[in-house]
Structures are given as C-alpha cells and as structure tokens.
Curated annotation (Swiss-Prot):
Protein name in the entry: Apidaecin 2+
Induction notes from the record: By bacterial infection.
GO BP terms in the entry: defense response to Gram-negative bacterium; innate immune response
Organism in which the protein naturally occurs: Pimpla disparis
Family: Belongs to the apidaecin family.
Length: 20
C-alpha cells in the first residue's frame, strides 16, 4: 500500500485580538 501523507491542518480563523 501507499504510505499516507499527513494532511496539513485546516486553517482556523483566529479571533480578533484587542488592540492595546
């Protein structure tokens, strides 16, 4: 069988950080 290639993690939208 073919070795499974690790899929890149899905990009998660980061919550907006409060600007100081």
């Amino acid at each position: 069988g073919k070795p499974n290639k690790p899929r890149p993690a899905p990009i998660k939208p980061r919550p907006p950080h409060p600007r100081l």
